[in-house]
């Protein structure tokens, strides 16, 4: 193929589309080596050197378009030198040619074989013959991308240009106002500023960025990919702290702008100081510390009314101190300046400045714990030792001291604290804790806040306590745990001391509790369990505590209330323990057999104790290997009589969380029959719930074979017979069986759903049938349903749509209620796909004023769509708004939850465009006035929020 003729090229230059098509074809020819690019340049010479400016623009555009379309590794070094020389020469051309030249240069600098020495020449020519800011916005964007690419890939060549490139870059950026271009600049310049020497131009470079601070920019709401003000501000801050030579200017700039009355300017200034503290070395910032501290002190001491400014200021101060911590001279200088201001105010907790002083004090500790903590603790110690120190003052001081210890520990400096000071503080704390040992101490009159505060200190200082102090603490802990009315949690302290001093804790605390356990009241025994069980993971105490629990659980002489406590403790123990521990206990003591025997043979066991036994059996069974689970079922299940309460609870424990791979086929029919009969005939609601859950779980886990399905079919037929006799309980049982089938994905689930939907028109069972759909759709965390069919909720939805679709059109109230229950469990995406069909049903359910549960569900579904500004609901606000206004009124059938949900939905509606809301504004604002007087505070709060939002519809934006 030959080089394109002049006629072909002239034709290509006539329109933009033809130019693009020709450039693509020429690029393919060049890639195929059909001809050389020099031949193309020669053929295109008539246009490139034409006296007609428009033709030169078109010719240059074609050449640049070809370069852009070429692979980056196609052209050779000699060809690229020739092209770069051409483009450098063209930089002198008319301004209209510049866009095409910029495109060509952009393509050239990305070519793999371009001699690296050409880069400085291209930049020199550009800076000499044109300016970036004289180009259009889109061309400036291309130029900034070029600068970004060059700074990242040609560092040595650009540094060889010395100040020429830096100066050219400064001129290119200076005056840029477009936020997208600024985003590009602020993104790549921090890396450039931190790696390139700025020479004598550091001040000029800093001023280029300083003029943008703080960012004052509001993105267009119509821009789908708008750059936010916060993003720009963050990137600008990174530029201002990118070079150590900017330190002085950055500090001055931040402090100057911190005086602004605008919140956003203050926050940006504080964040700039924070980033300066993080990025600049302490030696660079030290000369400016006094200025920074004075500025931050204004915002933190006595403190700014704005919580956001206060937190940001403390964060900046913390970063400043933490960075200086590894240079003792600088750190101590900083700390002395700050502590000199705040320490006098730590001595009086009633002073107005005490609270802000403590905040700054903790920041000092987080920065240089050994230095600051000693001085702060000593200041508190002087106050604690004063004769007029009250309990209220001690409480406040103790909580601050505990934070000082905690921060010191986090910084690894706890052991570095002055021994004399900390031991004196700890003595005072222990003395406060031991006040409970005094005979005149009346626990009923004391609020125990002092003791709680003392424990907070001891929790953090446990590693520092000496032997004498620990001995006193053990006595106090025994007194606390054995006190007949005091109940304070000190498990953190016992766990810490147990890890540090296991022998002492064993002899001075655990043994004392165990030895006297029998004589203590039930209240005290509960406290002992509470404080001993967290020590179980520590191997030194495991057996001792386990022996106590086992003895109290299985001793024949144990009273029922005490046994219940022991069973509760056993369950907590099994929850805390790992699998290996549980398996070991089972193997060593045959715990599972003991629990079953306890349930069956102990007279007078309460339902609560049986529930605890079932829970323990479940936790043990879950942790055992499948072979052992199967053996346990085979051993114990045949002998269980489900009509006995104890055996039912034991069955719950054994089967409730049995692994799904263990077959129950041999017992399946008997269990189904017994559980069904129990639920039909028992008046004990607790036993019926257990039966329902077991039925549901067993059906869910059953193996899908004809025999099992026949057994389930037999039970459902029995239930239908009972239903025909008007038995409400049979409807409930059918729903639970249906739930197990639905979740597992059995086809037979459709029959149960159909039966329930038919009952919705029954004169006496319709309510029970509607609640049956709630049972099927609701989530029950305590129910074990391990077989979960993929997308079963969607299948349930479509099944019910098929069964009830025609009936829903008639708007039977029970059909609506049942369908709302199903929608609660249906994924929102499925509802959205069917919203044209479901929308009228939702609106009708709101108008029917059903019972509270279904109303709350319907309102919740609507709210999810409205919060996302769904277009369907936008078109039906005329239906939605009146219903919500009616439901927001105080009426007997409108519970507090319904009224709040309706008002919240009305609030979310205000997110829709103003033109949609204006026709409703007056009516809604007037109607909501009644809700402002609702008897319930939470309803009134939501009403105020909703009414304010409607009142502001159409008001001018604050921006």
UniProtKB/Swiss-Prot annotation:
> Where in or outside the cell is it found?
Cytoplasm, Cytoskeleton, Spindle; Nucleus; Cytoplasm; Midbody
- Which GO BP terms sit in this record? astral microtubule organization; cell division; chromosome segregation; DNA repair; mitotic nuclear division; positive regulation of microtubule polymerization; positive regulation of mitotic nuclear division; protein maturation
Q: Which SUPFAM superfamilies match?
A: ARM repeat
Q: Where are the HEAT repeats?
A: 794-828, 832-871, 874-915, 918-956
Q: Which family does it belong to?
A: Belongs to the MET18/MMS19 family.
Q: How does it assemble?
A: Component of the CIA complex. Interacts with Xpd and galla-2. Binds to microtubules.
General function of this protein: Key component of the cytosolic iron-sulfur protein assembly (CIA) complex, a multiprotein complex that mediates the incorporation of iron-sulfur cluster into apoproteins specifically involved in DNA metabolism and genomic integrity. In the CIA complex, MMS19 acts as an adapter between early-acting CIA components and a subset of cellular target iron-sulfur proteins. Essential for diploid cell cycles, organ growth and development. Regulates mitosis by binding to Xpd and thereby competing with the Xpd-mediated repression on the Cdk-activating kinase (CAK) complex.
> What name has this protein been given in UniProt?
MMS19 nucleotide excision repair protein
Q: Which organism is it from?
A: Drosophila melanogaster
UniProt gene name: Mms19
């Amino acid at each position: 193929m030959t080089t394109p003729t002049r006629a072909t090229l002239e034709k290509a230059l006539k329109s933009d589309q033809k130019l693009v098509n020709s450039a693509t074809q020429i690029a393919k020819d060049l890639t195929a080596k059909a001809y050389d690019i020099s031949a193309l340049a020669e053929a295109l010479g008539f246009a490139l050197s034409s006296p007609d400016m428009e033709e030169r623009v078109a010719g240059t555009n074609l050449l640049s378009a070809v370069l852009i379309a070429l692979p980056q590794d196609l052209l050779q070094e000699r060809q690229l030198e020739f092209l770069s020389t051409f483009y450098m020469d063209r930089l002198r051309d008319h301004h209209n040619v510049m866009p095409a030249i910029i495109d060509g240069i952009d393509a050239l600098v990305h070519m793999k074989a371009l001699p690296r020495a050409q880069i400085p020449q291209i930049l020199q020519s550009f800076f000499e013959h044109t300016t970036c800011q004289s180009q259009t916005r889109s061309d400036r964007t291309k130029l900034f991308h070029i600068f970004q690419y060059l700074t990242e890939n040609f560092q040595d060549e650009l540094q060889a240009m010395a100040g020429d490139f830096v100066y050219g870059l400064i001129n290119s950026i200076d005056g840029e106002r477009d936020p997208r271009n600024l985003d590009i600049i602020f993104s790549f310049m921090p890396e450039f500023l931190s790696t390139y020497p700025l020479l004598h131009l550091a001040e000029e470079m800093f001023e280029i960025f300083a003029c943008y601070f703080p960012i004052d920019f509001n993105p267009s709401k119509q821009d789908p990919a708008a750059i936010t003000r916060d993003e720009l501000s963050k990137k600008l801050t990174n530029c201002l702290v990118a070079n150590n030579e900017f330190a002085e200017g950055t500090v001055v700039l931040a402090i100057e702008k911190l005086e602004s009355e605008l919140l956003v300017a203050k926050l940006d200034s504080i964040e700039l100081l924070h980033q300066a503290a993080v990025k600049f070395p302490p030696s660079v910032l030290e000369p400016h510390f006094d200025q920074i501290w004075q500025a931050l002190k204004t915002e933190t001491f006595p403190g700014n009314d704005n919580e956001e400014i206060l937190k940001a200021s403390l964060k900046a101060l913390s970063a400043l101190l933490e960075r200086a911590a590894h240079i003792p001279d600088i750190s101590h200088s900083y700390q002395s300046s700050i502590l000199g201001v705040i320490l006098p105010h730590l001595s009086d907790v009633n002073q107005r400045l005490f609270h802000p002083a403590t905040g700054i004090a903790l920041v000092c500790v987080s920065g240089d714990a050994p230095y600051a903590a000693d001085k702060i603790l000593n200041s508190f110690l002087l106050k604690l030792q004063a004769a007029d120190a009250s309990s209220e003052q001690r409480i406040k001081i103790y909580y601050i001291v505990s934070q000082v210890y905690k921060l010191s520990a986090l910084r690894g400096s706890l052991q570095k604290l002055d021994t004399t000071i900390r031991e004196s503080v700890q003595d005072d704390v222990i003395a406060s804790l031991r006040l409970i040992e005094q005979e005149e101490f009346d626990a009923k009159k004391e609020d125990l806040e002092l003791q709680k505060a003392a424990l907070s200190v001891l929790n953090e200082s446990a590693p520092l306590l000496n032997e004498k102090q620990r001995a006193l603490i053990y006595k106090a802990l025994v007194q606390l745990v054995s006190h007949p009315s005091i109940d304070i949690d000190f498990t953190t302290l016992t766990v810490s001391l147990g890890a540090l001093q296991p022998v002492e804790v064993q002899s001075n605390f655990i043994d004392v509790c165990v030895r006297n356990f029998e004589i203590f009241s039930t209240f005290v025994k509960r406290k002992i369990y509470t404080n001993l069980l967290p020590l179980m993971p520590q191997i030194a105490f495991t057996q001792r505590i386990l022996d106590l629990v086992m003895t109290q659980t299985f001793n024949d002489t144990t009273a029922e209330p005490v046994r219940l406590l022991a069973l509760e403790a056993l369950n907590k123990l099994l929850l805390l323990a790992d699998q290996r521990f549980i398996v070991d206990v089972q193997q060593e003591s045959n715990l599972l057999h003991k629990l079953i025997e306890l349930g069956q043979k102990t007279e007078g066991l309460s339902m609560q104790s049986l529930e605890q036994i079932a829970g323990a059996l479940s936790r043990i069974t879950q942790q055992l290997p499948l072979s052992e689970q199967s053996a346990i079922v085979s051993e114990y299940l045949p002998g269980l009589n489900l009509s006995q309460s104890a055996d039912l609870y034991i069955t719950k424990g054994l089967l409730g969380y049995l692994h799904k791979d263990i077959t129950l086929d041999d017992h399946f029919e008997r269990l189904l029959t017994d559980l069904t009969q129990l639920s039909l005939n028992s008046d004990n609601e607790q036993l019926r719930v257990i039966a329902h859950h077991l039925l549901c779980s067993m059906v869910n886990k059953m193996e899908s074979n004809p025999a099992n399905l026949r057994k389930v079919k037999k039970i459902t037929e029995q239930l239908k017979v009972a239903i025909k006799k008007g038995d409400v309980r049979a409807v409930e049982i059918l729903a639970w069986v249906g739930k197990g089938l639905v979740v597992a994905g059995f086809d037979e689930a459709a029959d149960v759903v159909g039966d329930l939907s038919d009952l919705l028109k029954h004169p006496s069972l319709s309510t029970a049938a509607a609640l049956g759909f709630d049972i099927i759709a609701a989530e029950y965390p305590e129910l074990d349903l391990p077989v979960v069919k993929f997308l079963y909720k969607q299948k349930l939805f479509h099944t019910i749509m098929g069964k009830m679709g025609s009936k829903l059109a008639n708007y039977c109230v029970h059909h609506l209620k049942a369908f709302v229950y199903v929608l609660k469990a249906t994924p929102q995406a499925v509802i959205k796909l069917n919203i044209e069909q479901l929308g009228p049903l939702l609106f009708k359910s709101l108008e029917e004023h059903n019972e509270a549960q279904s109303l709350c569900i319907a309102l919740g579904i609507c709210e999810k769509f409205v919060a996302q500004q769904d277009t369907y609901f936008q078109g039906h606000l005329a239906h939605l708004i009146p219903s919500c206004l009616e439901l927001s009124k105080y009426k007997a059938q409108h519970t507090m939850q319904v009224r709040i949900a309706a008002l919240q939905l009305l609030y979310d509606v205000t997110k829709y465009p103003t033109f949609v809301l204006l026709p409703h504004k007056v009516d809604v604002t007037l109607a909501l006035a009644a809700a402002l007087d609702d008897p319930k505070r939470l309803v009134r709060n939501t009403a105020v929020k909703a009414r304010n939002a409607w009142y502001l519809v159409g008001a001018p934006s604050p921006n």
